[in-house]
UniProtKB/Swiss-Prot annotation:
InterPro entries: GlpE_sulfurtransferase (IPR050229), Rhodanese-like_dom (IPR001763), Rhodanese-like_dom_sf (IPR036873), Thiosulf_sulfurTrfase (IPR023695). Its main location: cytoplasm. It comes from the Bacteria. This is Thiosulfate sulfurtransferase GlpE. Keywords: Cytoplasm, Transferase.
């Protein structure tokens, strides 16, 4: 079984530019206030549907607040058969200072 990889925002952006799926595991209100453009909100309610419809081999970047919770979520996705999973170090807080123009508001992309 493969393991997830921890990456900095710059590598997450490079993967994103190549079409990686970005999932955000922060709470819904925080996600709606500001998130990475094109990211999908993932929580206990949307997780099953996300896994059912996902390409398990597609690069998938998991984002949280500071890069801690995303590691658990990334490990869970690997356990569900995802083969190319990344946890972004520094989380959205580091992302928004590194790539402020690559953010969006609203509940879905």
């Amino acid at each position: 079984m493969s393991e997830f990889k921890r990456i900095p925002p710059e590598q997450a952006q490079a993967l994103r530019e190549q079409g990686a799926v970005v999932v955000d595991v922060r709470d819904p209100a925080t996600f709606a206030a500001l998130h990475i453009s094109g990211s999908k909100h993932l929580d206990n309610h949307s997780l099953h549907a996300f896994i059912q419809g996902a390409d398990l081999d597609a690069p998938t970047v998991v984002v949280c607040y500071h890069g801690n919770s995303s590691q658990g979520a990334a490990a869970y996705l690997v356990s569900q058969g995802f083969s190319d999973v990344y946890s972004m170090d520094g989380g959205f807080e580091l992302w928004r200072t590194t790539f402020p123009s690559e953010t969006a508001q609203g509940t879905s992309e």
